[in-house]
Amino acid sequence: MRADIDPAELRTWLPGIVIVDVAHFPDQLVYRLVGTRAVEVRGSDPTGKTVVERYFGTNRDEILENYRLVIEERRVVYDFDPTPSRDGFFEEAETILLPLSSDGAKVDKVLIYFETRRRTPVL
């Protein structure tokens, strides 16, 4: 449950944390909090925008399927995605998506943490 998470205990990981509000799947998944590393890798801050508008990765349908698994099936999802960046380097992103619930039943937020590694330029 959301009440079980203390943001102060997550301070070390805040740059890689993203929180998405779930109002209605898939069109009302809204970025509530986006860590500084997530903003840097994306090149802009998607806070307040929908996942459909501002998703990060190579395949929107796969990304939405990850959210569906978390929201509808209440599963933890791990994802690996080698995404080419604007400067020709690959950003290898490892992501974990966790369901959060205010009432212990319905998922109303998704807590995401990701790490990236830059790889050699694409020639």
Label each PLM-derived region with a short phrase.
Residues 1-123:
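Sensory/regulatory domains in signal-transduction proteins
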